Swiss-Prot record:
It comes from Burkholderia cenocepacia (strain ATCC BAA-245 / DSM 16553 / LMG 16656 / NCTC 13227 / J2315 / CF5610) (Burkholderia cepacia (strain J2315)). The gene is bphI. Pfam families: DmpG_comm, HMGL-like. PROSITE patterns: PYR_CT. Mn(2+) binds at residues 17, 199, 201. The keyword Cell inner membrane does not apply. Its EC number is 4.1.3.39. Substrate binds at residues 16-17, 170, 199, 290. Belongs to the 4-hydroxy-2-oxovalerate aldolase family. The record marks 16 as: Transition state stabilizer. This is 4-hydroxy-2-oxovalerate aldolase 1.
Length: 343
């Protein structure tokens, strides 16, 4: 099937998911510079918050260089055409955080839950719609549910008022056929006017291929990040995805060379380490582990001497999900004790 002429919305993750590899330490000036570049390149939606969403500043998730309010207040006035979104995970972010974001000018709220827990999003989705926001239901770790199970959860979020549903490959575990099955069945089940999106990670180097598969299956919003700046091996690299779309005739409204310049000149220089598919990031995708667990596992390796890869495989075996970051150190300690007993 030709996708020529299909119009999609590209949603930038560099300033939210990109907070994870930066340990939430992006400066206000860096935020402004990158946001202005994205805006000038034609990116229509830019997400700005702590990596774990509004209210994410904590011992469990990490303390950012600045508050969500400061980041949003720095970015929003700089933009000429792009709109700003914010992520909110019920249980981390509250309705008061949502009201704050709305008051500052955020136009899109993405309410994120584990892929089996859409029911916890009802209050936040309902309030967002009442406030007149573009309201997205964001089903994380979607590889852990079958297409039929995702349909049930997506329809719940739609019933609460979400005007867009996201299928989210938080672990970068899916292959194109997995994406096609999930996006296709959810698209068939939702109202025609409800939009559908896909969020990918590059842990198996499938970010671009999976995003194209999502578009072919009916998604019209796609997440990506300049230079792939995001958790694990990064999000779908936007400059590559936009170039592929351009080759295929998919209309993104984003200038290929301008977004490449943003990636090369603004994003790459702020990286603490290259965003690449090393053995630990590959293990995330292979074992189906939440991408933001990567640095937690690397820190546990440095502390306890257990290879991060072994820790990540164990986390995958335990089927840990986002929000269980405190269990990573527990798993490492258990592995240390087991090795001491075996010695």
């Amino acid at each position: 099937m030709s996708l020529a002429g299909k119009k999609i919305t590209v949603h930038d993750m560099s300033l939210r998911d990109g907070m994870h590899p930066k340990r939430h330490q992006i400066t206000l000036d860096q935020m402004r510079d990158i946001a202005r570049g994205l805006d000038a390149a034609g990116v229509p939606l830019i997400e700005v918050t702590h990596g774990d969403g509004l209210g994410g500043a904590s011992v469990n998730y990490g303390f950012p260089a600045h508050t969500d309010e400061a980041y949003l207040s720095a970015v929003i006035p700089e933009l000429k055409q792009a709109r700003v979104s914010a992520l909110l995970l019920p249980g981390i972010g509250t309705v008061e955080h949502l009201r704050m974001a709305h008051a500052l000018g955020v136009g899109t709220i993405r309410v994120a839950t584990h892929c089996t827990e859409a029911d916890v999003s009802e209050q936040h989705i309902g309030l967002a719609r009442t406030l007149g926001l573009d309201t997205v239901g964001f089903l994380m770790m979607a590889h852990m549910s079958s297409p039929a199970q995702l349909v049930v959860q997506a329809k719940l979020m739609e019933s609460y008022g979400a005007n867009c549903i996201y299928i989210t490959d938080s672990a970068g575990h899916m292959l194109p056929d997995d994406v096609t099955a999930r996006i296709g069945q959810v698209r068939d089940a939702l109202k025609p006017e409800t939009e559908l999106g896909f969020h990918g990670h590059h842990n198996l180097a499938m970010g671009v291929a999976n995003s194209v598969a999502a578009v072919a299956a009916g998604a019209n919003r796609i997440d990506a990040a300049a230079a792939g700046l995001g958790a694990g091996a990064g999000n779908t690299p936007m400059e590559v995805f936009v170039a592929v779309c351009d080759r295929m005739g998919i209309e993104t409204g984003v200038d290929v060379f301008a977004i490449s310049d943003v990636a090369e000149d603004l994003v790459v220089p702020i990286m603490d380490a290259p965003i690449r598919l090393d053995r630990d990031a590959l293990t995330l995708g292979y074992a189906g582990v939440y991408s933001s667990f990567l640095l937690f596992a690397k820190r546990a390796e440095a502390k306890y001497g257990i290879p991060a890869r072994d820790i990540l495989v164990e986390l995958g075996r335990q089927r840990l999900v986002g929000g269980q970051e405190d269990m990573i150190e527990d798993a490492a300690l258990t592995m240390v004790r087991a090795r001491e007993v075996a010695a």
